[in-house]
């Protein structure tokens, strides 16, 4: 396929046009008085949103060279979203500012490699300065404050802080669509997996159709149980304790299932059987998680263990297990806190190395179940359009809150970026590297400038006053007042701010050092069919 190639200034300018188109579309959403962008959807109603990464992903330009520039900025937004979960609009604004200033200097004859070196050095200094002034976030009120700022809703902030308090900072908090108009929080405590009882005759509450097991033993195996003789010695030992038994196995069938059901109906002992969760290697990992949580051992041939040889020592235990037709919940497993902590660390290390989004999602689910529960924020709204917009806002708020807990917070509204300018300005560089440093200094002003502009104020005036104010004092664009940003609750997670700056500097440096751009040449349009010709005459039979 033929290619179009552009070189030097022509190549960079084409890409920068794409950068500007995307950034100008996204940056109108920045700040408390940012506007919305309406996105056409192929199916269903249009999406109204102020989420930077969602907007960036939708933009596709007709010109291939411009589109490459737009896609690079979209990549900045996506990368920032992946790392910090928020700050995508800030990252886009910073990228545009660095690229625009950098291009002026490269066009004037500066060396792009030297400029890039200066940009990298200045960015590193700014990030270190941000980390140095970060304040830790702890406690329900502080977490609620962070979430409220990001979601622009105190109610959502309260839901997120309560969810994190209930399931822990590592716990899974999912966001689902509610059937009603109200947004509500639902928490499932303990480890839950999506497997229910194998027979309805195993229930203990016929009205609710659930089986409640108090202080049960738990048999965990990846084997199929077809012959009752395989587990008979173990059943006899459990029977002596008068405690219920939960069996988690690949399957229970043959004579084994009716035998267990018959003994349950007769009242001989209380037993519930469920299928093991997951499939393949993930099933083995989840069974091991359950074993660690409950203090048991997985009966598996991989460890050279047979069901007929299993002893009471291999059984796990829990304070309570609830099983319905679809789910099993294990509450307060008897596993040691050290073993659980080690297992959590193992899963976290796997999370850091995995490249698959699906694997990442499943690992996070496993982590949450071990950490103590799953919280579900059910989003309600009057219309589907409002529901989609609110769901995106809550997702951003949740991600920002987690980032704040992880690395701390700084003054929001772009104030922290202005406050670290002195550290960057003090960086001793010369030549084109010094030019790169100055480009970053100018870019650090841009988020404040855009927030002010979106709120109807003159950005330059706000920036001048901000530079002469004490550290932490900033401009509240929502009210037009000068306030102590952190005390007022206008904050940004350090992770969000530094990720936005690092990713923006990285991609902007790449664009400035681009010397050639190769794009697919558009295919010429097919010649129009002469009018009046019958399509059936063109060789078709």
Curated annotation (Swiss-Prot):
GO cellular component terms listed in the entry, alphabetical order: cytoplasm
Gene Ontology molecular function: any one: unfolded protein binding
Top-level EC class as recorded in UniProt: isomerase
Reaction(s) catalysed (UniProt annotation): ATP + H2O + a folded polypeptide = ADP + phosphate + an unfolded polypeptide
Entry EC number(s): 5.6.1.7
GO biological process: protein refolding
Purpose: Together with its co-chaperonin GroES, plays an essential role in assisting protein folding. The GroEL-GroES system forms a nano-cage that allows encapsulation of the non-native substrate proteins and provides a physical environment optimized to promote and accelerate protein folding.
Protein name (database record): Chaperonin GroEL
Source organism: Streptococcus equi subsp. equi (strain 4047)
